[in-house]
């Protein structure tokens, strides 16, 4: 196969070999077996680093997930047959895009199809955290509920509160739409300001300064992607700008928040609480989080619906099949965009 050919002219042989690093929904695996020479992970045990290194020696298309660290070493060790990394998921912070570009390896992701599910979960955390639902559920499960009292587990009203969204892309916009239905006032900080039409529809206020927005919000939600520019975007300094009655919700990536600084703020009562679906070193979670009653914690469930995961798999197949057929994949990710 010639190197450096444009995507439109690249055509792999029939039944190209693909390696899928995790178990996917059954309908997706069945379709992949029909279209490709597919090596599946039926036991759903994460591949070791050595197994990943072996996979890129034989696969023409690698289909990884967020749990796979496809760094420069993995990519540089790949054989010349590896032409595509078709990621199962929208986030690609676990893939070294620059190294892939240098080897003319196409990278794709699965945007759009998980927007609504992730926004739903984000809205759930926005509701659960101030209303202390996690605490209440634990009390009932542990048979500790002694009955209703006027002052038991009093949380904070959602209606009328100021919601600050960091990252007004697809998911951030979908969260804003839901938040309006609960009477929250929408504020946002984004790399680029959204259109007047979207701002008007959402009655959203744009803040050019993230620092200033943080200092005025009741709830802060992180929906921006993880990139080198957003690593520890909520640093210790920025976390200290938050009001004591502020709640933080993160359904993006754990490394966008300085987790140690967040723990310190939560322990001291400098902020009111947090709703977290992602963690900096997941699945390893700092045990301090587990003991905090003012923290709602979930195991990275953002897009975890049957419909969403099947749609993500279908998107992977479309990307891979387009490439195999010599066409430009619809969801190509370029290193320059990040």
State where each predicted segment sits:
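Phosphate-binding beta-alpha-beta segment of Rossmann-like dinucleotide-binding domains, i.e.
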Residues: 111-162, 174-177, 181, 188-191, ...
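Phosphate/diphosphate ligand-binding glycine-rich loop within oxidoreductases
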Residues: 59-141, 155
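C-terminal helix-to-coil terminal segments
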Residues: 2-16, 108-121, 148, 154, ...
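Conserved N-terminal Rossmann-fold NAD(P)-binding element of oxidoreductases
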Residues: 21, 164-166
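Short, well-ordered coil/turn residues at beta-beta hairpins
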Residues: 21, 65, 88, 223-226, ...
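Hydrophobic/small residue at the entry helix of a nucleotide-binding pocket
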Residues: 171
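N-terminal glycine-/charge-rich "phosphate-binding" loop or analogous flexible N-terminal tail
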Residues: 1-59, 183, 324
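Rossmann-like adenosine-cofactor binding region
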Residues: 70-73, 192-288
């Amino acid at each position: 196969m010639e190197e450096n050919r444009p995507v439109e002219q690249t055509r792999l042989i029939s039944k190209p070999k693909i390696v899928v690093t995790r178990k996917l929904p059954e309908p997706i695996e069945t379709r992949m077996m029909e279209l490709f020479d597919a090596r599946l992970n039926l036991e759903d045990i994460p591949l070791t680093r050595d197994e990943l290194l072996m996979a890129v020696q034989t696969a023409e298309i690698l289909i990884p997930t967020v749990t796979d660290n496809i760094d420069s070493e993995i990519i540089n060790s790949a054989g010349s047959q590896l032409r595509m990394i078709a990621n199962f998921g929208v986030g690609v912070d676990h893939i070294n895009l620059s190294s892939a570009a240098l080897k003319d390896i196409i990278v794709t992701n699965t945007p759009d199809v998980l927007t609504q599910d992730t926004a739903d979960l984000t809205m759930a955390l926005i509701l659960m955290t101030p209303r202390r639902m996690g605490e209440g559920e634990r009390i009932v499960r542990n048979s500790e509920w002694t009955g209703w009292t006027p002052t038991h587990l009093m949380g904070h009203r959602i209606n009328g509160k100021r919601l600050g969204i960091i990252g007004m892309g697809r998911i951030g916009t979908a969260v804003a739409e839901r938040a309006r239905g609960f009477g929250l006032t929408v504020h946002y900080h984004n790399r680029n300001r959204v259109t007047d039409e979207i701002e008007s529809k959402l009655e959203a206020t744009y803040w050019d300064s993230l620092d200033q927005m943080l200092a005025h919000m009741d709830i802060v939600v992180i929906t921006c992607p993880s990139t080198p520019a957003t690593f520890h975007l909520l640093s210790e300094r920025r976390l200290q700008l938050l009001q004591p009655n502020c709640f933080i919700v993160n359904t993006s990536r754990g490394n966008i928040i300085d987790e140690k600084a967040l723990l310190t703020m939560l322990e001291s009562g400098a902020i009111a609480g947090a709703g977290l679906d992602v963690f900096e070193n997941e699945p390893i979670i700092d045990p301090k989080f587990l003991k905090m009653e003012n923290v709602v914690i979930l195991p990275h469930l953002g897009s975890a619906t049957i419909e969403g995961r099947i749609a993500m798999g279908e998107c992977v197949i479309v990307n891979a099949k387009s490439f195999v057929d010599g066409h430009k994949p619809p969801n190509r990710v370029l290193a320059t965009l990040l």
